[in-house]
Design a protein with these regions (language model features):
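Donor-binding and catalytic core of enzymes assembling or modifying cell-surface/extracellular glycoconjugates
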Residues: 186-276
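Short, solvent-exposed loop/turn segments at secondary-structure junctions
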Residues: 9-11, 37-40, 112-116, 159-163, ...
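Short, aromatic/basic amphipathic alpha-helical patches
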Residues: 43-57, 207-216, 277-284
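N-terminal pre-catalytic "stem/leader" segment of glycosyltransferase-like enzymes
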Residues: 1-42
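Leloir-type glycosyltransferase catalytic cores
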Residues: 273-297
Length: 309
């Protein structure tokens, strides 16, 4: 049995699930999800209001009752070892080589935002992250627009909300300015020509005021509290031909789940503003990076739009 602790929003929970799914697949073990942290059960204390958000997918894994996880993690008798061995991700997203040697009966705690942790189980993860039909049906009209577009479609994600209003999150992640999106779109346009933008955001007013939008572009907004709507938005992202990401695990997954073999994915560099965080393995090597620190009068260098090495 592999048990993974869930925390954060949809994108974070997906990384946690994917890492646990890969470890379980290596050992032919069952994957169990511990939602006690986000539920606030069993004495767990979360600093943010979250909930279990993986219900939008057709998952076979189950969410364990907090009492069961508690029994597995601790020994009833002092002389007995806990049933599960705990493995915690190193601080600041540092690589965890112990994960590759982890055995069955392991409890995973961390964010695990590293594609190498589950690349050997990619087929399992993609199959598991199949959206339920009712999720896809929520935005069927927008999905039709994406499919009927005569020019390539681009999913562009803008995240503001907590990145602006929460000092801790703002200091760690930082916000992306209009110049990043402008340079990303210029780089895309130089390779594929005219495109139609589908902008997904928690701040539509900011997007309309700060992004270069045409009449044919679509801006679709949702508040952070609308979890079901965000799930349908991620599903829409997967339908687009190309992707411009925010520094958010949400749009990371929207791009990664896209089945297009010719997709171009643009991600900001650095991903996390706090330089203590390790970025090795966070961005797939075939994706491209645009520096987020450009000013409006500083065009990108010739080496900016290049594969990550």
């Amino acid at each position: 049995m592999i048990v993974v602790q869930l925390s954060g929003g949809l994108g974070n929970q997906m990384f946690q699930y994917a890492t646990g799914r890969a470890l379980a697949a290596r050992h032919g073990a069952q994957l169990v999800l511990d939602s006690s942290w986000i539920d606030g059960a069993g004495g767990a204390v979360s600093t943010e209001v979250r909930r279990y958000e993986l219900g939008c997918f057709e998952l076979e894994s189950r969410v364990a009752p907090v009492e069961q996880v508690g029994r597995l993690r601790r020994s009833v008798l002092p002389s007995r070892r806990p049933t599960l061995r705990e493995l915690e991700e190193p601080p600041f997203g540092q690589p965890c080589p112990e994960l590759l040697q982890a055995t069955d009966n392991t409890y995973l705690r961390g964010y695990w935002q590293n594609v190498t942790y589950f690349e050997d189980a990619e087929a399992h993860v993609r199959r598991d992250f199949t959206f339920r039909p009712e999720i896809a049906a929520q935005q069927a009209d927008v999905a039709r627009q994406i499919g009927a577009s005569p020019v390539p479609t681009v999913s562009l994600h803008v995240r503001r909300s907590d990145y602006v209003t929460d000092p801790g999150v703002r200091d760690r992640m930082g916000t992306l300015e209009p110049e990043y999106y402008s340079h990303a779109l210029d780089a895309l346009g130089s390779g594929i020509g005219s495109v139609r933008l589908f902008v997904f955001t928690d701040d539509p007013a900011w997007c309309r005021a700060n992004l270069r939008l045409s009449e044919q572009d679509v801006v679709l907004g949702a508040t952070r509290a609308e979890a079901d709507k965000w799930a349908s938005i991620m599903q829409l992202m997967t339908l687009c031909d190309h992707h411009v990401l925010a520094n958010s695990s949400f749009s990371w997954w929207g791009a990664w789940l896209s089945p297009s073999p010719t997709k171009i994915v643009v991600a900001p560099r650095p991903w996390v503003q706090d330089s203590r965080w390790d970025e090795n393995g966070r961005i797939p090597s075939e994706w491209v990076r645009i520096d987020r620190g450009y000013q409006a009068d500083q065009p990108p260098s010739t080496t900016t739009f290049a594969p990550v090495t």
